[in-house]
Amino acid sequence: LKCNKLIPPFWKTCPKGKNLCYKMYMVSTLTVPVKRGCIDVCPKNSALVKYVCCNTNKCN
């Protein structure tokens, strides 16, 4: 799986076991991701942070 880094078009190949790409947003600025990468389990959203996860190449 290939996931975008914080600034596309840069991306990386995920290590074994991390089969999801994710984007993390601050709830106050939902249009600007603050973190992107590979992850094994999609984290739960909180009052301050929202996660968007997906499982296809460079979908984040």
Curated annotation (Swiss-Prot):
Q: Which GO terms describe its biological process?
A: killing of cells of another organism
Intrachain S-S bonds: 3-21, 14-38, 42-53, 54-59
Which InterPro entries does the entry link to?
Cytotoxin_Cobra, Snake_3FTx, Snake_toxin-like_sf, Snake_toxin_con_site, Toxin_cobra-type
What superkingdom heads the lineage? Eukaryota
Query: By its UniProt entry, which Gene3D superfamilies does this protein fall under?
Result: CD59
In the record, what terms sit under GO molecular function? toxin activity
> Which PROSITE patterns does this one have?
SNAKE_TOXIN
Main subcellular location of this protein, as a coarse class: secreted
Does this entry carry the keyword Membrane?
A: yes
Keyword Secreted appears in the UniProt entry: yes
Q: Where in the cell is it found?
A: Secreted; Target cell membrane
Tissue expression, per UniProt?
Expressed by the venom gland.
Q: Which Pfam families match?
A: Toxin_cobra-type
Q: Which CDD domains match?
A: TFP_snake_toxin
Can you list the GO cellular component terms from the UniProt entry?
extracellular region; membrane; other organism cell membrane
Keywords carried by this UniProt record: Cardiotoxin, Cytolysis, Disulfide bond, Membrane, Secreted, Target cell membrane, Target membrane, Toxin
Subunit annotation = Monomer in solution; Homodimer and oligomer in the presence of negatively charged lipids forming a pore with a size ranging between 20 and 30 Angstroms.
Q: What does this protein do?
A: Shows cytolytic activity on many different cells by forming pore in lipid membranes. In vivo, increases heart rate or kills the animal by cardiac arrest. In addition, it binds to heparin with high affinity, interacts with Kv channel-interacting protein 1 (KCNIP1) in a calcium-independent manner, and binds to integrin alpha-V/beta-3 (ITGAV/ITGB3) with moderate affinity.
By sequence similarity, the record places it as follows: Belongs to the three-finger toxin family. Short-chain subfamily. Type IA cytotoxin sub-subfamily.
Descriptive protein name: Cytotoxin 4
* Species this chain originates from: Naja annulifera (Banded Egyptian cobra)
Supply the source organism's classification. Eukaryota, Metazoa, Chordata, Craniata, Vertebrata
